[in-house]
Regions:
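Interfacial helix-start motif at the membrane-water boundary
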Residues: 43-61
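Cytosolic, membrane-interface loops and tails of multi-pass inner-membrane proteins
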Residues: 25-48
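Structural signature of hydrophobic alpha-helical transmembrane segments
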Residues: 73-84
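C-terminal ends of transmembrane helices
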Residues: 21, 88-100
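Core segments of transmembrane alpha-helices
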Residues: 12, 56-67, 109
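N-terminal signal-anchor transmembrane alpha helix
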Residues: 2-26
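Juxtamembrane boundary at the C-terminal end of a transmembrane helix
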Residues: 116-120
Length: 120
């Protein structure tokens, strides 16, 4: 795996740890309200908090498995699988929620795939 791919895939992992933080730890924070464009009253609803925390675990696991693939197993296949997963989720989010998601969430993942194609 090239150093460029390693750096970009690490950025994708860190981004998902940050999303985990917002969704599972800072559920009712100003940052979470801004990122997800929801008011604090909505974020305080138990059903919303529960859904966010559940989604946060998925994002943390994406980060964990990317770090595992990059630094422990040195498996390009694992990195590709999880980066494609991120691109798929970002594409769905762009189609159903906010078009900017494809750049914000998907951008680093797309750059990672491109770096794999060009630099492996």
């Amino acid at each position: 795996m090239s150093i460029i791919t390693t750096i970009l895939a690490t950025i994708v992992a860190l981004e998902h740890f940050y999303i985990f933080y917002l969704e599972s730890i800072a559920t009712q924070s100003d940052a979470n309200s801004r990122v997800f464009n929801m008011n604090k009253e909505e974020l305080a609803r138990p059903s919303v908090t529960s859904l966010f925390k559940n989604q946060g675990i998925y994002n943390a696991l994406i980060g964990v498995f990317l770090i595992y693939g990059i630094y422990f197993s040195h498996s390009l296949e694992i990195v590709i699988i999880f980066v494609l997963f991120v691109i798929g989720a970002a594409t769905y989010g762009a189609l159903t929620a906010d078009k900017k998601i494809i750049l914000k969430q998907g951008g680093p993942a797309i750059l990672t795939i491109l770096s794999i194609l060009f630099f492996k």
